Amino acid sequence: MAKKISDPNYKVIAENRRARFDYAIESDLECGIMLEGSEVKALRGGGSNIADSYAAVENGELWLVNAYIPPYEQAKMFKHEERRRRKLLVSRKELANLWNATQRKGMTLVPLVLYFNHKGIAKMKLGIAKGKKIHDKRETEAKRDWNRQKQRLLKDNA
């Protein structure tokens, strides 16, 4: 499960809860996201989904691919495309680090959380991740079950 952003000034819009189950997250970073006006309004309304999306470095730019932002009903002429590619904003140094990380075998960029920061600006937390094998997923699930059982036993004995 993704870590909750502890500051109450942050408003989480969408969370990729499957990412921590399907991938081993090595590190994460915060980046900005270029949105159209109707997309910002739609995000404030809720209903967006980043579970099927990923990030890719192409031509020296970082892109978010296949993220769903629902249409904003009050936008008449300037409606946005729901699953269009959106540019992610990072510094050149971070972009170089991300590109180097994705060149290693099995590494990918996974969106973890989409949120508004304390200034009301949309931000995304990206994770540099490696896909887990089926036995790794089973192991993670077994550890989680064991931790639940330990907590239950401690609660019952106390």
UniProtKB/Swiss-Prot annotation:
GO molecular function list: RNA binding
One annotated Gene Ontology cellular component of this protein: cytosol
Source taxon at top rank: Bacteria
Ranges of compositional bias, category Basic and acidic residues: 136-158
InterPro entries named in the record: SmpB (IPR023620), SsrA-bd_prot (IPR000037), SsrA-bd_prot_CS (IPR020081)
CDD domains: SmpB
Disulfide bonds: none
GO biological process assignments: trans-translation
UniProt main location, coarse: cytoplasm
Region (Disordered): 133-158
Keywords linked to the UniProt accession: Cytoplasm, RNA-binding
Subcellular location: Cytoplasm
Biological function: Required for rescue of stalled ribosomes mediated by trans-translation. Binds to transfer-messenger RNA (tmRNA), required for stable association of tmRNA with ribosomes. tmRNA and SmpB together mimic tRNA shape, replacing the anticodon stem-loop with SmpB. tmRNA is encoded by the ssrA gene; the 2 termini fold to resemble tRNA(Ala) and it encodes a 'tag peptide', a short internal open reading frame. During trans-translation Ala-aminoacylated tmRNA acts like a tRNA, entering the A-site of stalled ribosomes, displacing the stalled mRNA.
Family: Belongs to the SmpB family.
PANTHER family: SSRA-BINDING PROTEIN, TMRNA-BINDING COMPONENT OF TRANS-TRANSLATION TAGGING COMPLEX
UniProt protein name: SsrA-binding protein
Species lineage: Bacteria, Pseudomonadati, Pseudomonadota, Alphaproteobacteria, Rhodobacterales
Gene: smpB
